[in-house]
Design a protein with these regions (language model features):
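Conserved N-terminal beta1-alpha1 strand-loop-helix module at the mouth
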Residues: 1-78, 82-86, 90-109, 135-138, ...
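Non-cysteine beta-strand/loop elements that form the S-adenosyl-L-methionine
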Residues: 108-116
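A short acidic, helix-capping loop that chelates divalent metal ions and anchors anionic groups
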Residues: 116-122
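Recognition helix of helix-turn-helix/homeodomain-like DNA-binding domains
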Residues: 125
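Glycine-rich S-adenosyl-L-methionine
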Residues: 128-135
């Protein structure tokens, strides 16, 4: 398989011991860790980032507080519904339609979701049929820079690869009660 990417997204709320858990996740060899705490203040984000080495910070992508990206030499910023404007430090964005994927050509990568029914968001159902995803691969819309998000489990990784995605982004599968599920993360990387 090409350069398969695994992106881990943090739970919505900061938690005790988070910095140590982030270090363990990054040590697994993931592509990026998306630090997604929409309600966290800048001081909370700084506390987390201050506990990471320079190399570890290079793997971090922020969903908020973009002013910290250059200051901490982070991996980038992620555009989302809260921050849809193009930031100069932007590297990725969330897409919920194939048209949005096509329009995201300036990004290093983008998430397409929900591919399967969400694990972490109750009632957030798959947005794409098998036929639509296979056609999008044939049309060159789904490729190495498109990351599948939503309902991703170890058992679905092979199917995601068959659709032509460049990797997976995981949230619900990656965390349980503030503990990173390192075995699952490692299996996703195979």
């Amino acid at each position: 398989m090409r350069n398969w990417k695994v992106v881990v997204i943090t739970p919505e709320n900061p938690f005790d011991g988070e910095t140590e858990q982030i270090k363990k996740v990054i040590a697994c060899g993931i592509f990026r860790l998306h630090l997604r705490h929409p309600k966290a203040d800048e001081q909370t984000m700084r506390r987390i980032l201050n506990g990471l080495s320079a190399d570890e910070r290079g793997k971090i992508v922020l969903h908020d507080h973009y002013n910290l990206v250059d200051e901490y030499n982070l991996g980038g910023a992620h555009l989302n519904g809260r921050h849809p404007e193009l930031a100069s430090v932007c590297s990725s964005r969330s897409c919920h339609s194939l048209a949005e994927v096509v329009a995201s050509t300036g990004m290093r990568y983008c998430f397409l979701s929900p591919i399967f029914d969400s694990i972490s968001k109750s009632g957030y159902a798959s947005n794409f049929s098998d036929d639509v995803l296979r056609q999008a691969k044939k049309d060159g819309i789904i490729n190495e820079r498109v990351i599948a998000l939503g309902g991703i489990t170890v058992g679905k990784v092979q199917q995601v690869k068959e659709y032509g995605f460049g990797g997976v982004a995981i949230l619900g599968s990656a965390w349980k009660d503030g503990i990173a599920q390192l075995d699952i993360i490692k299996q996703m990387m195979e």
